[in-house]
Amino acid sequence: MSYNYVVTAQKPTAVNGCVTGHFTSAEDLNLLIAKNTRLEIYVVTAEGLRPVKEVGMYGKIAVMELFRPKGESKDLLFILTAKYNVCILEYKQSGESIDIITRAHGNVQDRIGRPSETGIIGIIDPECRMIGLRLYDGLFKVIPLDRDNKELKAFNIRLEELHVIDVKFLYGCQAPTICFVYQDPQGRHVKTYEVSLREKEFNKGPWKQENVEAEASMVIAVPEPFGGAIIIGQESITYHNGDKYLAIAPPIIKQSTIVCHNRVDPNGSRYLLGDMEGRLFMLLLEKEEQMDGTVTLKDLRVELLGETSIAECLTYLDNGVVFVGSRLGDSQLVKLNVDSNEQGSYVVAMETFTNLGPIVDMCVVDLERQGQGQLVTCSGAFKEGSLRIIRNGIGIHEHASIDLPGIKGLWPLRSDPNRETDDTLVLSFVGQTRVLMLNGEEVEETELMGFVDDQQTFFCGNVAHQQLIQITSASVRLVSQEPKALVSEWKEPQAKNISVASCNSSQVVVAVGRALYYLQIHPQELRQISHTEMEHEVACLDITPLGDSNGLSPLCAIGLWTDISARILKLPSFELLHKEMLGGEIIPRSILMTTFESSHYLLCALGDGALFYFGLNIETGLLSDRKKVTLGTQPTVLRTFRSLSTTNVFACSDRPTVIYSSNHKLVFSNVNLKEVNYMCPLNSDGYPDSLALANNSTLTIGTIDEIQKLHIRTVPLYESPRKICYQEVSQCFGVLSSRIEVQDTSGGTTALRPSASTQALSSSVSSSKLFSSSTAPHETSFGEEVEVHNLLIIDQHTFEVLHAHQFLQNEYALSLVSCKLGKDPNTYFIVGTAMVYPEEAEPKQGRIVVFQYSDGKLQTVAEKEVKGAVYPMVEFNGKLLASINSTVRLYEWTTEKELRTECNHYNNIMALYLKTKGDFILVGDLMRSVLLLAYKPMEGNFEEIARDFNPNWMSAVEILDDDNFLGAENAFNLFVCQKDSAATTDEERQHLQEVGLFHLGEFVNVFCHGSLVMQNLGETSTPTQGSVLFGTVNGMIGLVTSLSESWYNLLLDMQNRLNKVIKSVGKIEHSFWRSFHTERKTEPATGFIDGDLIESFLDISRPKMQEVVANLQYDDGSGMKREATADDLIKVVEELTRIH
């Protein structure tokens, strides 16, 4: 068995469909967006889109249509999934709670039938008499719409026209009538049929039109008064209604294929059209009024409005605003203007919605050396191509920033006694102090009476009896608030300089070298109570009051130089309660007593970024439970702040971190800032609930996210990225990309638009000694699109394209790796290519090119001709492992800097994927699943260990551990194969057993080992082993991790219980949705826990939680089973959410 947990780290972002209507109420205008398995419901308001609800469907949404049957006050939603579940949904709201009610449901899959190549089509008769589905060739499926039917039942009508391209119901027909484009050996034709519900048959339709354009691909049914249909082709747009026929062939639409359309006006006089290049057109139907008052179509006109993201779907909302749903780039809200701008465009983007899809490749890197992976993806395609940098952390939203270098500390003040909010910020520098007045959002420098400005401040704040305090290197100064004047000052008796200080509302402790002085704050008086001498100099101290001690701290925490110790002293006597030797050479720089979730802690940060934390007993001053984490490489300063009414600690360093507690465990979360030296909380009128943060050069005021989430940065390339790798020595990424160029009259090609490879700082072009013939142009015609492939070298800090290297004509770059080879000290970028010609079934030649990038130059070090396409390449024990068409080949790197073949393995159809671990190689084949090879270094050859004999068409593979291998295949499933080392016969040993099966519902393009969260920080009790991330076509990022058997069984039990409690939208069974499903077989899911379902436990109500845990047996780590409580499971699930 294999025990795995699969969970979503980023939900799918690519938009597959969108509709608009009145779903939430008759008055609301709604936009509904489908992102694969997720349905998002928005209300269209004057301010933009307001999200109402997000629904996770147990299925890939294939069809989504709003309709309003007679007698309904608002629209209902029809959904069909890829596994042929159908449902009719209704929106119900009572108070705050929103429900999506399933009015009717069913499954319309046929036992036999060939799924149509042109995909699933679902249409609804305008009079809401029936739903029509085209799922299989030669069949038209009808679901009659009766109001009372809870179960949706369908019947098939045979369709002689096997190859239907598109079909729609016509408007204004007595009987439901379909109009469709179909193809036969003679070409493409348009035909209509009436659908008879009684006979369950087709009757002859009102009209037909033979031999329309050969590329006719879309039918648009036109409402009355015109009626009829518009047929859209590659070059022409035609209108038919039986007695009228109109055709136009505007040259403007010829450049690209129209892929989506949407009606603007209810009467069908205007339509939006979107094409593959992201151009947006308006199709206008001009009317002519006849003498008898009827309206006929006079003319068709097409106008280019401008450019948008490449649209998968369009929907017109209101007031000239259009939603552009994109699968290949970010989706947009655009405004259509009456007048064009300077570029001649009528389209203005108002808002963009991030889309990571399609994720074609990705790599995990720790760029800032922060012990936390960032994911860099190759996302999008064509002009929407980009790199996306994704990291998990707590975001800071900047509201103001001031250039102020050299800040050594900062504190908020309420200078006016009658204020609830801060109005002043005090900044400390070496040898001086400056005061900033906050007036609304304005910030100006000012002076405070009673404060000194020519010394460095160690502490400043509001204290008891309406007073302010300023502790500088020279003295402790007490200042009255009203009027502002110095009322008391304390200096060290020999006038020595204060080195560190800590203060709360009524107590002060200062250190002068080894001496400690304890003062109390009284009205207009600082009273020295006691002092003591330590054996070493004091490096840091803290007297934060904990518990309910009336704001007084009975304890003082100090860190000492020389013996590197942390100590807890009793006030006022300075009696030593506890001494903790921290060990090592590095001095403590910051110490803090704090309370998280009513447990008291002592935190002590050293000068090298290490942080010790202990449990603190405030009665006895004893420390317990010592733990250590590393939070950076530089001295760390600890400050508390409050967020969501809980205490948090901000650790300022070169790797700023927020420390908080969850389930009585400390959690350390990255803050998405490069560096923070000092911070303080700030709550002023202009900047409520904010933080002030200082680095070496700048003061920033901002607000902080309440939760950790994924932050996405976009680097547009304007061309298609294919592969990415990271090279640490040159601090660069290598990216393979392709741009589209068009053949011109001279036989050359021209780029369609500027993009990353045409705008690089420097560039070079391949010239190969290997293929003399390849440079002779193959047959291409004028206006034909060709792909031009490049290797881009991209700076890891600025993401600037430093160099672009263009490959040969017709040469496709397929694989990329950065590695060292043999004993050669250099690190190389190595690219595998193929010469691709349309007349060849598969590539017959390609090359492996070895590049070195150093000092801003890219040099070709070696090239090797191969007889085929170099699909994947990986570094393998100092050698280069590549697969060329069906052969897996190992090259060694000679001292002459040449690649020499060492050994081959031939037993594949097309070896598309390679992963290695030690001497083992996992090969993923186009159609023959996975195979495990072992390299024998003594013999210098490959041995076939075992293979999976199931015919899986692979899309990605990964090695989980020595015995478990993860695969993704093209029917959206995941599986795990296991090597059976204990098998007794050779035959059994050669079989990889499928021990894990799961329907993911996503097409996985890439797996890679790595994590999006901080590694090894804090404590965790969830025994998850390893972390493999995956990226999909829909822009989803997921994670697979391995579990122990006992945890797997607990979560499986929990999953089954959750399925009884959580009602699925559309009444689709979870077990049906997750069952492994291909055209060959369907098997129940096994070996995988659905993490998304487990995490939904946190969102359900308390009574439902109780229902889930009833009689659930749980081992709390003591080895004994007991009945679980809801809180036990909340803890378990919260821990699991922290892995992504």
Curated annotation (Swiss-Prot):
GO terms for cellular component: Cul4-RING E3 ubiquitin ligase complex; Cul4A-RING E3 ubiquitin ligase complex; Cul4B-RING E3 ubiquitin ligase complex; cytoplasm; nucleus. The modification N-acetylserine is found at S2. InterPro entries: Beta-prop_RSE1/DDB1/CPSF1_1st, Cleavage/polyA-sp_fac_asu_C, Quinoprotein_ADH-like_sf, RSE1/DDB1/CFT1/CPSF1, WD40/YVTN_repeat-like_dom_sf. The lineage of its organism: Eukaryota, Metazoa, Chordata, Craniata, Vertebrata. Belongs to the DDB1 family. Residues 2-768 are annotated as: Interaction with CDT1. This is DNA damage-binding protein 1. The core of the protein consists of three WD40 beta-propeller domains. Pathway: Protein modification; protein ubiquitination. It comes from Pongo abelii (Sumatran orangutan). It is found in: Cytoplasm; Nucleus. The modification N6-acetyllysine is found at K1067. Component of the UV-DDB complex which includes DDB1 and DDB2; the heterodimer dimerizes to give rise to a heterotetramer when bound to damaged DNA. The UV-DDB complex interacts with monoubiquitinated histone H2A and binds to XPC via the DDB2 subunit. Component of numerous DCX (DDB1-CUL4-X-box) E3 ubiquitin-protein ligase complexes which consist of a core of DDB1, CUL4A or CUL4B and RBX1. DDB1 may recruit specific substrate targeting subunits to the DCX complex. Residues 391-708 are annotated as: WD repeat beta-propeller B.
